[in-house]
């Protein structure tokens, strides 16, 4: 999942939406990798285990400071798998806007400098990664990052891409 990541500054708690910018150091790209079968087999209520393996949340290629992004809710996000465009959306299509995310997270916990929030995606154009793939994410104004996928078990899955409820 190609997502915008928020790099936080703190410590802060209870940040209202109108003050969301004071909680943000900057923005970067994150590939939110999921081992969906692992998540489903280990915990019925969700997939947190399937998102918790080493290397499953690569960040980069840089951190743009918050003043360099005029509107984090209007950025083009693209994801390629081995050169094929799989996923493209605008951050205005995320389920929750950045001010709402900051308000919600800080209502639950104190955020500290360096904490990162993955903002989510629109869930269309998702598909499996396999050994030998090159996963690339690009976010408008932030940059482009490439990751070489390595699976020592050399597993493979059908190359189906989820394109919404009718796919």
Give each language-model segment a name.
Residues 13-27:
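N-terminal accessory regions of nucleic-acid-interacting proteins
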Residues 36-167:
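Catalytic-pocket segment enriched in acidic/His residues
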Residues 1-2, 23, 57, 73:
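Short, basic and Ser/Thr-rich N-terminal targeting/leader segments
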């Amino acid at each position: 999942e190609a997502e915008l990541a928020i790099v936080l500054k703190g410590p802060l708690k209870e940040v209202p939406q109108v003050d969301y910018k004071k909680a943000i150091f900057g923005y970067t790209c994150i590939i939110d990798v999921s081992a969906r079968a692992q998540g489903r087999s280990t915990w019925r209520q969700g997939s947190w285990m399937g998102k918790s393996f080493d290397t499953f949340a690569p960040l980069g290629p840089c951190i743009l400071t918050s003043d360099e992004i005029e509107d984090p809710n209007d950025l083009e996000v693209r994801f390629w798998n081995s050169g094929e465009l799989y996923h493209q959306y605008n951050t205005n299509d995320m389920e929750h806007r950045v001010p709402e995310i900051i308000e919600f997270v800080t209502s639950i916990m104190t955020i500290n400098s360096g904490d990162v929030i993955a903002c989510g995606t629109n869930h269309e154009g998702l598909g499996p990664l396999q050994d030998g793939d090159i996963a690339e994410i690009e976010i408008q104004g932030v940059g482009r990052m490439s990751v070489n996928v390595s699976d020592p078990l050399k597993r493979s899955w059908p190359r189906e891409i989820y394109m919404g409820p009718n796919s």
